[in-house]
Regions:
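Intrinsic-disorder/low-complexity signal
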Residues: 36-172
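Alpha-helical protein-protein interaction scaffolds
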Residues: 1-35
């Protein structure tokens, strides 16, 4: 399934990878709660060239409300690592998938397995203010245990000043 079949894919440049992982986790949650449907779920995933999520992960997914702004996600770990658009990986583990400069995102930083360098400090930078004058959106933290349990934490934000940083707290 290609996103371009449903919308202007350039406006959601980071979405296909994030959505593919979402589907794998949703499938795992479904199988955990309806084990008799496992073969059906696996078959539907295979038809779409998707995979059932089986490993723990923590994802930080940033969305925003207008396509004319450039909002960047920054994550710092307890070991002094800093991931952002110019340095997309932390030595402690984790990867920023893409730097989305046009469209609505999402920008996603994912840690495979269990996080090993907590606490993580989360912030955003209003890199380029668009004609709207403000950046508004959401950082969603998704924790998947690899066994079919998924939890969410939402951290909304509004950023008003070009080049400003907004602290979105820590994650343990």
């Amino acid at each position: 399934m290609r996103l371009a079949a449903y919308c202007d894919a350039e406006l959601f440049a980071g979405a296909e990878r994030v959505l593919a992982e979402d589907v794998g986790m949703i499938g795992a949650v479904y199988v955990a709660h309806a084990p008799g449907k496992r073969d059906e779920v696996l078959g539907q995933l295979a038809k779409r060239r998707l995979a059932l999520a089986t490993q723990p992960s923590t994802r930080f997914i940033m969305y925003w409300e207008t396509d004319a702004n450039d909002v960047d996600f920054h994550i710092r770990d307890a070991r002094g690592g800093h991931a952002w658009y110019s340095s997309k990986q932390l030595r402690s583990g984790g990867e920023l998938y893409a730097d989305i400069t046009t469209g609505y995102g999402p920008e996603c930083f994912a840690i495979r397995g269990k996080p090993t360098a907590a606490p993580y400090r989360l912030s955003i930078n209003y890199y380029s203010q668009g004609p709207m004058g403000y950046g508004m959106g959401l950082l969603q933290i998704q924790k998947f245990d690899g066994q079919g349990n998924l939890s969410f934490e939402d951290r909304p934000y509004v950023i008003m000043t070009d080049q400003a940083f907004v602290d979105l707290g820590t994650y343990r």
